[in-house]
């Protein structure tokens, strides 16, 4: 009897390993239409009762996006040092934090994920957002610390040309259009309002954004387009990594 139980356990373990191996071989190059259908229905039925009834559907769609994220992560790790360990680990929870929100609906109506670059020398991060009518990719610095923000501004004030060169490049403009993010209406403390780079110094956030249609996200070329977009962020990330890890004389911090 014990031998039979042991054999059953071994077979179960082998089956699980086979499933994991097959999942690793799956290359999800797009976001299935079923993900959008589920999120549209969730938007119309954003309550716990509906979600409980449709929980299995949610897990199926979440798994589809996780497979896409796994495929994308595999591509990204060939050209950047990413510390995110798996596509599943990159995804954010669908449950909302409603403690400080007027909107008390319990669930997000999107599925998003982020890849974190490894080591303090590699700054910036990659974000992908799946939502009906609002798919986009993002990257950059959403909320730099006061110390980092001051250092960025000092570096830009000392020599704005490297950043201007990146922002005016054909690839940057064709991919992102312009640098996004909140800006001060007046010069930050300690900076001259007439500084020739005040348009850049006034930024509080430094964001790169590219929008996609639902149809584009469902296309087999979506993975290729996402990878190309993230690659186009690299000159900006390399610049920010350099100025955030060196002083005004170019010496390591």
Language-model features, listed with the residues they occupy:
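Long, solvent-exposed, polar/charged low-complexity segments
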Residues: 22, 26-44, 48, 65-69, ...
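Compact, glycine/acidic-enriched structural inserts
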Residues: 131-185
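Active-site acidic/histidine clusters and adjacent loop/turn architecture
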Residues: 40-94
């Amino acid at each position: 009897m014990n031998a039979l139980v042991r054999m059953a356990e071994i077979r179960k373990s082998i089956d699980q390993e086979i499933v994991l191996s097959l999942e690793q071989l799956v290359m999800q190059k797009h976001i299935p239409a079923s993900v959008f259908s589920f999120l549209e229905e969730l938007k119309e039925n954003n309550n716990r009762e509906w979600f409980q009834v449709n929980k299995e559907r949610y897990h199926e769609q979440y798994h589809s996006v996780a497979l896409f994220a796994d495929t994308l992560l595999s591509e990204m790790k060939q050209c950047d040092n990413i510390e995110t360990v798996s596509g599943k680990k990159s995804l954010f929870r669908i449950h909302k934090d409603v403690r400080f929100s007027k909107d008390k609906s319990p669930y997000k109506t999107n599925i998003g994920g982020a890849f974190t670059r490894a080591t303090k020398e590699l700054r910036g991060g990659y974000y992908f957002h799946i939502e009906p009518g609002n798919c986009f990719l993002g990257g950059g610095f959403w909320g730099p610390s006061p110390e980092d923000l001051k250092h960025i501004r000092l570096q830009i004030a000392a020599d704005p040309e490297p950043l201007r060169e990146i922002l005016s490049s054909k690839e940057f403009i064709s991919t992102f259009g312009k640098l996004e993010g909140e800006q001060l209406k007046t010069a930050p403390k300690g900076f001259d309002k007439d500084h020739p780079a005040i348009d850049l110094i006034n930024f509080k956030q430094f964001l790169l954004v590219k929008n996609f249609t639902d149809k584009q996200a469902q296309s087999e070329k979506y993975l290729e387009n996402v990878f190309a977009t993230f690659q186009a962020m690299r000159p900006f990330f390399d610049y920010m990594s350099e100025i955030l890890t060196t002083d005004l004389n170019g010496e390591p911090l």
